[in-house]
Amino acid sequence: MYRGFIHSRFRPSMLGTAVLLASVHAQGDNAGAPAAAVILEQTTISATRGEQPLDTVPSTVSVVDRERLDRDNVNDIQDLLRHEPGISAGGTGQRSGINGYNIRGIDGNRILTQVDGVEIPDSFFGGPYAQSQRNYVDPEIIKRVELLRGPASSLYGSSAIGGVVSYYTLAPEDILMPGKDIGARLKSGYSSADEGWLTSATLAGRTGEFDTLLHLSQRNGHEKQSFGEHHGTGLARTAADPQDARTTNVLAKAGWHYTDDDHLGLTYERYRDNRDIDLKSAYGGPYGKGVGRRMYRSRAGNDTVSRERQGIAHDFSLSSAVADHIKWSLNHQTAKTDQRTVEDYLPYNRHVLRVRNSHYQERQWVLDVQMDKAFQLADTEHLLTYGSQVRQQRVTGSRDGYGTCLRAFGKCRTAGADSRDDRLKKSSDFPDPTIDTYDLFVQDQIRWDHWTFTPSARYDYTRLTPHLTDAFTHTVNPGDKYPVADGTRTWHRLSPTFGVTYDFDGHYTAYGQYAEGFRTPSAKALYGQFENLAAGYTVQPNPDLEPEKSRSYETGLRGRFGGSSFDVALFYNQYRDFIDENAIRLGTVQNTFKSMNIRRATIKGIEFKGRLDLHTLGASEGFYTRGSVAYAHGRNEDTGQPLNSINPLKGVFGLGYERQRYGGALSWTLASPQNRVDSSAFKAPDGGGAFNTPGFGLLDLTGHYRVIEHVTLNAGIYNLANKKYWVWDDVRSYDGTGEAGAVAPANLDRLTAPGRNFAINLVWNI
């Protein structure tokens, strides 16, 4: 029966809680029976900024809950996306690690990634000694992840031009069992891919109107293995560079439920990842045309990535003409990347121990206010959602260094003396910006008969103020060749979206959506500059960059039949002034990196996923099959060349069996060769172009078993056939000989994904 907004509105989390209680009750009864062949209704929050059934939203959203995170042994972003075509994450073999999400060929800082509504920092690149990525979240604090494909600027602003990844952290009600006031969740796990151990504990309690939660977790591991087995040095090395890694995470919450519908909560979160890295692949460098100049006799690094957040949130109901429900939150977050590099450096005129330090920090305050009002107008039911967000970001960065003579040679008169040639005064590659953003948004979900119409719009005003710090003026004279253009830059934009869904008969739903998006240039792209003549490259600013703009069209059809389902989506995205932050101008002596606007670009594609209950075809109850396929095609309309951010065709197919107490699945991943590559920016020593990844097929076997009540064992064997393969996102900036400009050359075998590996975890809910 059709459910309207007024008579069946759920306050946030009630839908998810209902599903959870149903699941717990089912597990308690008939534990040995086959699992019911019914797909429980999933919900989404990110698609409309309010909890809605997934089938009612006019966009494509993947929802991964806590149970699936455990069953799939998700230890990082790449594990999360293992069986999710159309979304990927690269960074294998790189010092800075996983570099964030790629959704339908749009990646990097164009994907809004948020934790409880607070955006995590952008990535930053400033040469081999300064690289920050966007992996600031540990999966253990997450109760669900939502992956929203396509532009969402009308709800989330500039950062969401390519999609939204929303992490929602654990709350006390996720740990406490029905009828209990004290609960705990203990977990331990191991992954052979990086020889990593996990220890995690979450405690929750409730007394009267108050509840609390405390989570502590730690990971200890090493480098993620490649398929290569040569443990030498330099470009000949095919094994991963050695690492010792430790990640710790703390989450604390306290809440006051002063009525059934009103809640005031405090949150503290701290993430810290520390890695010691022996960069054996850099020994003998720098490299050019495959030949090392033998200046780096050794190179080691220590990288620390941290994020700390404090927040207060208030949800309350009221009966007024303005709103039925209001929620507001105020958060402060500080995120840092500190990198230290120590190298035995032997150029032609000295022998020194050289140290390089880099620091990147984003500090932000975010105030978010959202209201909703349900009302009826003639034959239509409305859910009006509107609000505002005010955000201030302060971005700082610096680098410094020194050198100590190791022996008397050339300019080094005595061992232990300071090397003036290697002294680097505190400098910065960009003028530290303050970014102030003011947003207003409104959305109306209108239900009429079987139709739901969802118009929405958001107005964004952004002001970027660069600051001429001493560190920046040490790098460049503001009155010289690359001035900081006219100080403050401002942008404003109205982003509309219109979506529609039609429910045919409770089984089929069709939808369509038109959305506009935009993204403002970063301070680094506008003003950032860096020069490394010895390595043969420079990074130049482009103060004339225009904001990116997009228009997106999507249509799809969904079907639900008990334990079977399917979803198909077609999309077509147009981009204007698309910013290529890795644009390269090739030179005879050195290469120049400079952000450039691509005037016109298009991305189009199709995605399909489905699940079939094989019991309907005569198989034993509990058997099912599933499959998903994603295809995208991107084109730079200015040059006619492909967009290198597009992943090749990929599909994941599986056969599974589920009972209440145990289950398992065999998954088959297929990826086609990457045949559409723009090689115009590559200058390979052998005259070739970019490295094109070959196709591959992988088998994964996973299973879970409830040992006793509330204790579950999850295990998986991945790349079962031990295949050698490359993921396109890991190698797309490399040419056929393994050189990436002059920044991070690598033997391509060192960038391969792990061979056969396994992961296991044990979860105990008390």
Regions found by a protein language model. Give the residues of each.
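Short loop/turn motifs that connect adjacent beta-strands in outer-membrane beta-barrel proteins
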Residues: 156, 172-182, 209, 261, ...
